[in-house]
Every structure is written in structure tokens, then in C-alpha cells.
């Protein structure tokens, strides 16, 4: 895959980034170098290799899930101007 100036300008337009011609020319070379590196990475055989989430092994501490009401409903709505049965009351905005 190769990136040209028109592609750089189109991507810049979609990202709402102002790019002048000199910068677009420079970015073309940089993006082509990045894409070349990505193509090299795609050539590496990674069959049978587990994905790594951290460079050091870490066991996740697990706990049992418990369904609760949180026990702080009154505190959550304490500063609300209008509440009803521990729910926020807001003006109707859709008919």
C-alpha cells in the first residue's frame, strides 16, 4: 500500500486538520515509512504465540459477583432538586 499527497490531504480533511502542501509532502514519506514497517510486521509468523497483555505475568484477582442496590441511593440523589423514590426527576423533553 502506498500513500500519495491526495490521500494525505483527504485524510487531513476528514480529520479536520489543516495541512499545507509542504507538510503533505513530508507526511506522505512518513506515512509510507510507517506502512512499510506495518507490512514487515505482517510478514512475521506468530502462529501458536499467545497474545501478551503485559511484559510481566500478572494474575488477576477475582471476586464473586454480588448483585446489590449499592446501598447509597439516598446519598446519590441527595443534592438533586427533585427526586421520587430515589430517582432523579427531570422535565419532560420528548412528547
Swiss-Prot record:
Gene3D superfamilies: Glu-tRNAGln amidotransferase C subunit, N-terminal domain. SUPFAM superfamilies: Glu-tRNAGln amidotransferase C subunit (SSF141000). Allows the formation of correctly charged Asn-tRNA(Asn) or Gln-tRNA(Gln) through the transamidation of misacylated Asp-tRNA(Asn) or Glu-tRNA(Gln) in organisms which lack either or both of asparaginyl-tRNA or glutaminyl-tRNA synthetases. The reaction takes place in the presence of glutamine and ATP through an activated phospho-Asp-tRNA(Asn) or phospho-Glu-tRNA(Gln). InterPro entries: Asp/Glu-ADT_sf_sub_c, GatC. Pfam families: GatC. GO terms for molecular function: asparaginyl-tRNA synthase (glutamine-hydrolyzing) activity; ATP binding; glutaminyl-tRNA synthase (glutamine-hydrolyzing) activity. Keywords: ATP-binding, Ligase, Nucleotide-binding, Protein biosynthesis. HAMAP family: GatC (MF_00122). It comes from the Bacteria. Heterotrimer of A, B and C subunits. This is Aspartyl/glutamyl-tRNA(Asn/Gln) amidotransferase subunit C. Its EC number is 6.3.5.-.
